[in-house]
UniProtKB/Swiss-Prot annotation:
Listed transmembrane segments: none
Location of the active site: 181 (cysteine persulfide intermediate)
Substrates-to-products reaction catalysed: uridine(34) in tRNA + AH2 + O2 = 5-hydroxyuridine(34) in tRNA + A + H2O
Keywords of the record: Oxidoreductase, tRNA processing
Protein EC: 1.14.-.-
Enzyme superclass (EC): oxidoreductase
Organism: Xanthomonas euvesicatoria pv. vesicatoria (strain 85-10) (Xanthomonas campestris pv. vesicatoria)
Rhodanese domain segment(s): 127-221
Protein name: tRNA uridine(34) hydroxylase
């Protein structure tokens, strides 16, 4: 059994190279595969391996005070979904190219999966405001599934989101907007940018779609959640669409 993990942390990294070297050494020591992005704004990880080795790696990482509160999302597969280990240093751990959307300067308010499920059941938030779920993912990902009635945008990359959202601004003015993505990292930046751009009615879904699946299942969601590895997509029970032996 392979344990698949997704995790990120926005935190100031003074020396990304030193962190990247340490992560690479530990991941190799524990025979993990996947991808890790390190930047001055934090770290973004997708790693898979044996349960004991995954546990040892994250115990090492979270012993660092910068990552002690990092939330790790887990799922299982019969086979390793990554071909190799890649650790890279980038300008951002998720490219958005907006100076007005830095999670190092603050965090937009969030809504938990349990609360969002109740809002979806009621068709409104706790104050009686209409609800709009904003999918911040690419069209390729949305094709595999999204929340029922979500506002989806015809974008190919995250940096396209501000322009694609502009025609919808008026329709969102009187609603509570919940931005969501796969694991939380994109909707965190998107919600911050929307706040900075004058929208004071924006929340982010805590933990993203995968966190929602993990905590409350698939209620209100149609289809699967696309992931960027050989599993292709996960259903609300976090089971992969593809679970094949790469070596066969």
């Amino acid at each position: 059994m392979i344990i698949n993990t997704a995790a990120y942390q926005f935190v100031t990294i003074q020396d990304p190279q030193t962190l990247a070297d340490g992560v690479r050494a530990q991941a190799e020591q524990h025979a993990l595969k996947g991808s890790v992005l390190v930047a001055e704004e934090g770290i973004n990880l997708f790693l898979a391996g044996a349960a004991e080795q995954i546990g040892a790696f994250y115990a090492w990482l979270q012993a660092d005070a910068r990552f002690a509160q990092m939330r790790i999302k887990y799922s299982e597969s019969a086979h390793q979904p990554f071909a190799r280990l890649k650790v890279k240093i980038k300008p951002e751990i998720i490219s958005f190219r907006r100076d007005d959307a830095s999670p190092l300067q603050g965090r937009a308010p969030s809504v938990t999966p349990a609360v969002l499920r109740e809002w979806l059941r009621n068709g409104q938030d706790d104050r009686g405001r209409p609800l709009v779920l904003l999918d911040t993912r690419n069209a390729q990902e949305v094709a595999y599934g999204t929340f029922q009635g979500a506002l989806t945008l015809p974008i190919d990359k995250f940096t396209d989101l501000p322009g694609a959202l502009e025609p919808h601004r008026g329709a969102l003015a009187d609603a509570t907007v919940v931005s969501f993505c796969t694991g939380g990292i994109r909707c965190e930046k998107a919600a911050l940018w929307m706040q900075a751009d004058g929208m004071d009615n924006v929340l982010q879904l805590e933990g993203g779609i995968l966190g929602y699946f993990e905590e409350v299942g698939g209620e209100g969601y149609e289809g699967r959640c696309f992931v960027f590895d050989e599993r292709v997509a996960l259903d609300p029970e976090l089971k992969p669409l593809v679970d094949a032996d790469r070596t066969a």
